[in-house]
Structure formats: structure tokens, C-alpha cells
Amino acid sequence: YQKLYGVSSKTPAGWGEISRYYYQFYNTKYVYNPNVKWETTITRNLGFDFGFFKERLSGTVDIYWNTVKDLLVPSDIPGYTGYTKLMTNVGQTSNRGIELQLNAYIVETKDFSLNANFNIGHNKNKIDKLASGEKEWILTSGWNKGLMNADDYRAYVGGTSGLIYGYVNDGFYTVDDFESFDAKSRTWKLKEGVVDSSPLSDTPRPGNAKFKKLTPVDPNSANPYQLTEADRTVIGNTTPKFSGGFGLNATYKGFDLSMFFNFMYDFDVFNANKVMLTTWADNHENNFGMEVASDRRWRNFDDMGNEIRYSPEILAEFNKNATMWNPTSIGKPICMSY
């Protein structure tokens, strides 16, 4: 059994049957739904086996089409119910693909044997249906609660799963991106048409990270070139085009050796480590990645420790070979492509 109570000397005496302290033991986000049922998987398969050279070389080709119906997904419900979500059987996904597997007996003697195997597959998945009436979801992976615009994945009807959703990085600002510099107020003024990335990074200045604006420019806006959440787009796909593996198995008298390797081709990775190690987010002056080493990043201080950020000509010359933004310009982790 598991005890459901405890004693703590830090808690002062209370009153009533359960004291004056409130403890929430259950997540009240989802309301109970008595109508949920098992998900249903429909599998369609066509395959054939083959063998050559007295089965020393054999293999299998498999073509499939699988559909998962009545997928359990959370649906939004009115807040006045006391809950925010209701689990319902309304989602549907499908997978279509082909797989090839090969086996070869290369050597077969009394004391020694060697065989190899290889497999490769191509799978294409599709989101057929989401919650009732919903066509798109912007989801969060949850890896960092401080992530700016924390919803970093997109799912929509007709699309594939695993789509990374974020901003498109456009390098960093250089001195040439600015119309003027006011030495008195130490402020930079962007040229007309240059994107204002301040909602994501620090006030635009040379060396700060820059992002692409993908939405149409609104001439009636007070700042038409400023970045907004609407400028996010699909920046990657975590589903590989091909995946597979190959292996070797060898035996010699009483000994055996096995090796197996997996591979995936043409897919993207949400590299959260790289995000954290190229920004000031939660870094607390710890180590950065090599991408922002002193000989690569934009620097506002020269080798002697002199501040040069307010000297446009010197700043431009000193950073002419920089390939990375200044990491201090980004204070929170951002889902972006670069």
C-alpha cells in the first residue's frame, strides 16, 4: 500500500478537519467523459518474399496503409464548466509507406559463419482530422517554460506530424542596416524597410539577432516592419524521408559478434542545446557554444576591453569577419531556424 498522509514540523497547527491549508491532489484541467472508447487501427498490407541462390540472399517487400480512427484528442470547452479540456474520440491519422528487408548468408562453414542484414523504409504520415471543427493546432514540446512563443510545433488537417514552428533567422544587424546613430542618446535608427526584431531580441543595434518578416507590410501601422507572432512559419520537419538499418553477425567456434547500425535521412532536429548555448537565456554567465566563440561572434568590446559599440566606424571594421550575433542580444530561448 502507499500512505496518503505525512507529518511536517514546518506546518503550524490549523483548525477544522483538514486544517486551513489547501492541497490540490488532482489535475482539474480535463473533465471526465463517459463516452470515450478505444482507438481503432485499420491496417492494409501487401507484401511478398523472395529468395535467390538457395536462399543465401532473401528479402521482403512490404507496402502498407494504416489508419488510426477515433484518436483520443483534447477538445476545448467553455471555461464556465470549471474545466478547459474534454478528451474525445475525434482525431484521425494515416500512414502510408513501403519497407524493404534483405538478408544475406555470406559465409557458412563448420567453424565460421558471417551474415548481413539491411532494411530501409519510407513512411508518409498525414493528419486527417483533429478535434471537432478545428483545422489547426499550435502545440508546445514543453522543453523550456521560458521559451518565447512557447508553442513550437504545428499540426493541421492535411499536414504531417512533427512540423517545427518558429521564426526564420536572418543573421544579425550590421552597421549598414542603420540610417543613423545618435551619439548623445546612443540610439540607432533603422533604415526604411529593415525588419525591426525588437519583440524577440534587444532594441535593434549592430550585432543583435535579426529575423525575417513573412507577413505583408501594413502601411497604416505605426511600425510596419516590426516582427509579430504572425511571422512564424514551419521551419522544419522531424519526420525522416527514409529510415533503416544494417547489421553484421559473425560466429567463430564458441564466439559470436553482432553489430547493428540505424540511420535516418532528410529530417530536421529541434536542437534545444544549440538554442540555449547561443543566447543569453538562462545562461547566467556560464559556457556558450563554439558558434559564439570570440573569433566568430559580434563583439562590442575590443581585445583590450575597450567599449566600441558606440563608434560605428570602429565597430564595423572590428566585426567585419563576424559570422554570429552577440548572444547577449537574446534574453529568452527562441524557436528559430539558422
Predicted regions and their residues:
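Flexible, glycine-rich loop/tail regions that form catalytic "lids" or insertion modules at the edges
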Residues: 225-226, 246, 272
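Glycine-rich phosphate/pyrophosphate-binding loops
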Residues: 252-272
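Membrane-interface anchoring segments and C-terminal beta-barrel signals
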Residues: 270, 299-338
